[in-house]
Regions:
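Bulky hydrophobic/aromatic packing residues
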Residues: 16, 29-31, 65, 89, ...
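Long, hydrophobic N-terminal alpha-helical segment
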Residues: 12-47, 51
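Solvent-exposed, charged/polar functional surfaces in cytosolic regulatory/catalytic domains
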Residues: 33-37, 110-118, 152
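Terminal low-complexity, poorly structured segments
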Residues: 1, 30-33, 111, 139
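Short, helix-capping/interhelical loops that line the mouth of catalytic, cofactor-
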Residues: 1-22, 68-130, 165
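Generic structural concept
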Residues: 24, 28, 53, 60-64, ...
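Short, contiguous alpha-helical
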Residues: 43-87, 125-165
């Protein structure tokens, strides 16, 4: 069987837009699932945790801050801009509140919508920023961490084990 290999397909802009839409959808589902867990848990369990053994509140704050931050990093890199701060947020349990979690979820959803609507059809895929664990990644590398991050933390929480992510 012979194949035609195309290095620059004509439908790349549509493929990119669909990828953004799909990742945003998975992230939205992750946020919904996370908020459901937060709503169902007691205040004691929500505020439990330590710097080395995170409780649900810390996980929620971490996921939502990362979701928003990565969406903005992806958009900046795609535009050829500096990514800004790329470190890992580690929330203290004493700083967790239900209202704060709801606010962070709204901010993450707003950033995801902005990513979906403002991502350029021909992004800069050469500019990179250092991920705290994976090293230098372009906008697509960063984008694809979002669903994995939700999945890792939420699966670990449901299974009663810590997530190395």
């Amino acid at each position: 069987m012979s194949l035609l290999v195309v290095d620059n397909p004509s439908d790349r802009p549509e493929w990119i837009a669909e990828t953004i839409r799909l990742v945003a959808g998975v992230a939205a589902e992750g946020r919904r699932s996370l908020l459901h867990l937060v709503e169902e848990t007691t205040d004691v369990d929500l505020l439990a945790g330590s710097p080395d053994d995170w409780g649900l509140g810390q996980i929620a704050v971490h996921l939502l801050v990362v979701d928003r931050g990565v969406s903005l990093i992806v958009l900046r890199l795609a535009r050829g801009e500096d990514a800004g701060n790329t470190g890992q947020p580690r929330p203290a349990p004493s700083r967790v509140t239900r209202e704060g979690i709801r606010t962070l979820a709204e901010k993450a959803a707003t950033a995801a919508e902005r990513l979906r609507t403002d991502f350029p059809p021909e992004p800069d895929d050469h500019r990179t920023a250092a991920h705290p664990f994976y090293g230098p990644m372009n906008c697509f590398g960063w984008l694809l961490t979002i669903p994995n991050h939700y999945n890792a933390h939420l699966s670990a929480y449901r299974e009663g084990r810590p997530s190395p992510l």
